[in-house]
Amino acid sequence: MKPAPRDIIPYPRFPAAASRDRGLLSVVIPCHDEEQVIDATHARLVAVLPETGMDFEIVYVDDGSRDGTLRRLEAIAAGDSQVVVIELSRNFGQQAAMSAGLAAARGDAIVITDADLQDPPEVIPEMVRRWQEGADVAYGRRRRRAGETRFKLLTASLFHRLFARLMPYPMPVDTGDFKLIDRAVADAVNALPEKRRYLRSLVPWAGFRHEPVWYDREPRAAGATKYSPWKLLKLAADSLVLSSDAPMRLTWVAAGALAAVGCGAALVAATSRQTGLTLAAATAVLALVAAVQTAAVAIVGEYVVRAYREAQGRPSWVVRTTLGRERAKRGSSRAA
């Protein structure tokens, strides 16, 4: 048999829509310092998931919590056979925690959501219905976002639209990580070799049939957000660099604009009789050149750093313990 080309990712064919009425639904929830809300999250999940008509499992991933989150998850798993708890060896970040849960999930369909209840679990049955009707990805699209400042709403909206414009494939806007994906989509994403991941762009990259499920995002049920303005800025930079080469290509645009400015400054210098004005124009152009060069070097440096990290070959996460499955292992690791 002729081997498949190396750039083709093998994964199972997705089932026909008629075969999706039953099966196993996995819900993956990354957790970091969610002690105050995790019991309420679990209660709402177990109340709403039977409405889907599917068997289900809930996969909690403790991402190096420093509070009592892990103890609460252990207590939940002890009383519920449908719960799996994956404890990472340290805090690897939300994207790594979601990827760890996605790799461990066994469902025919997999829902990814956060533990803070801003994305209401009551939307999940509608996502399942869309999947049963033939969608391979049913992603939550936010109609309203309660409890957030106008500044955050504006900056998030602008970033989502800029990000979508820079992607070479269709990218939904006004969305987060709240989505249902088919087993075939999960297999395709899990098979990707890169270790630093941004699932919001990897799932659309995989293709398949996507449908939005509109909902109103709720205020955080308890606790505080784990994303400071600095972390949000870092996430935005990571998402762009990990998902697109557009930032490097934009340096060509900057170079062209700088050339135009330089020509204009040269023209001013040639026609002006005021020495002070000529000196000021030259100084401004030199400062602009230095700024653009520094920015270009910084952008290239970001890509070099990420290439270096990929070349190191380290796993994206390390699992310390797994609770709730007979095949639980200690000290395992997995490269995403």
Question: Which stretches of residues belong to each language-model region?
Answer:
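Hydrophobic helical membrane-anchoring modules
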Residues: K2-D21, Y198-A336
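Structured catalytic core of nucleotide-sugar glycosyltransferases
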Residues: K2-T149
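Short conserved micro-motifs on helix faces and helix-strand junctions that flank
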Residues: P30, L88-R90, K179, W252, ...
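Generic recognition of well-ordered alpha-helical segments
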Residues: A40-A43, A47, R71, S157-H160, ...
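Conserved amphipathic alpha-helical interaction elements at protein-protein interfaces in regulatory
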Residues: A47, E51, A75, G79, ...
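Acceptor/aglycone-binding surface of glycosyltransferases and processive sugar-polymer synthases
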Residues: I86-R90, Q94-A104, Q118-L199, E218-A237
